[in-house]
């Protein structure tokens, strides 16, 4: 009698196309995200979206802990606890130092309440692929007590702006099947499903 393989929920890849940007902007101009509106359920939180620095390290680790725990609870088959820190100082320093990656943080009066990690993906080596420059939103998380206050939307707007500054053609994000709220969030911003990645336990 053969063992029946169990279907595991999929992850979806979402993308949004970008128009070319008109030249680089300064860190202060990243605060453009402050004026972006969205459909948050609570009163918007006054924030400034800026480039992260290592001075934000402890607050960023707390946010990564929150994000990791969400995934551990929903997908224990894929994510497991590991010794702290949530991300090493060296790893974050590398993201900040490279021209093709960065971390954006949402700063409020009480500190850092959200972050987004952005990575530029190398073009495909496949001759049949249309040349694209893609920025991936590798992580985006808002502190639990500040969700629904338009922080995530303003972070995402700043992420798209950062991508435009670097002449990206698309911004992409992978969303696990369990995270329906995240899927609705990205779709409301204009992202559209591109690839459904299906997996099967062997």
What are these regions (language model features)?
Residues 14-18, 22, 27-58:
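Conserved N-terminal entry element of GNAT/NAT acetyltransferase domains
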Residues 90-104, 136:
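A short helix-loop-beta-strand connector motif used in the catalytic cores of GNAT acetyltransferases and
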Residues 105, 111-120, 136, 141:
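Conserved beta-strand in the GNAT
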Residues 122-137, 147, 194:
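A conserved beta-turn-beta hairpin within the catalytic core of GNAT-like acetyltransferases
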Residues 148-161, 188:
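Conserved acetyl-CoA-binding loop-helix of GNAT-fold acetyltransferases
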Residues 153, 165, 177-195:
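Conserved active-site alpha-helix within GNAT-family acetyltransferase domains
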């Amino acid at each position: 009698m053969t063992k029946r393989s169990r279907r595991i929920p999929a992850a979806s890849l979402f993308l949004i196309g970008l128009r070319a940007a008109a030249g680089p902007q300064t860190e202060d101009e990243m605060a453009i995200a402050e004026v972006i509106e969205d459909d948050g359920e609570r009163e918007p939180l006054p924030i400034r979206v800026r480039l992260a620095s290592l001075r934000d390290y402890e607050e960023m680790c707390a946010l990564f802990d929150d994000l990791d725990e969400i995934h551990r609870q929903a997908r224990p088959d894929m994510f497991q606890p590991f010794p702290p820190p949530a991300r090493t100082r060296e790893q974050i320093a590398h993201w900040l130092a490279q021209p093709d990656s960065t971390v954006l943080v949402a700063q409020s009066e009480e500190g850092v309440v959200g972050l987004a990690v952005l990575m530029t993906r190398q073009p495909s080596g496949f001759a049949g692929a249309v040349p694209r420059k893609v920025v991936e939103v590798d992580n985006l998380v808002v502190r639990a007590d500040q969700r629904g206050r338009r922080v995530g939307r303003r972070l995402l707007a700043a992420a798209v702006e950062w991508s435009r500054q670097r002449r990206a053609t698309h911004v992409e994000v992978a969303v696990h099947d369990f995270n329906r709220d995240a899927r609705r969030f990205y779709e409301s911003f204009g992202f559209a499903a591109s690839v459904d990645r299906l997996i099967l336990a062997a």
